Amino acid sequence: MPKQECLNTWFLRYIAEYSITQTDKGWRWKFDDNMFSSLERLFGYKFEFSCPALFIHGKNSLLMSGNILTNIKEMYSGIMDFNEVANAAHHVPLDKPLEVIDIIKNRLF
């Protein structure tokens, strides 16, 4: 995952306390980092939703640079809306937690 600064230390502390686990090989994330080695199987996959969908992304996200976001929008703009959050990197809730809540609330209500 891309490295980014975070001013919300309470959020970082929560992640540190609940998202890592100690193993016989040391400390590790609780998710399976091997999943990133096979993401190419999703390229060209056409997701279908039977409900409204919203893609929230940070304007400064390294993973949304280049043609990545353009390609995602081309492929899915017919079935989902896109919301860019200014001054946020890849992990949008870390940078702008209240803005993410507002975006979701405005979408739902």
Residue ranges and their predicted role:
Residues 1-24, 28-33:
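Helix-rich cap/lid subdomain of alpha/beta-hydrolase
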Residues 20-75, 81-84:
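Conserved serine/cysteine hydrolase catalytic core
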Residues 103-108:
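C-terminal alpha-helix
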Residues 3, 74-78, 109:
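Secondary-structure boundary motif
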Residues 82-101:
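Catalytic histidine-centered segment of alpha/beta-hydrolase-like enzymes
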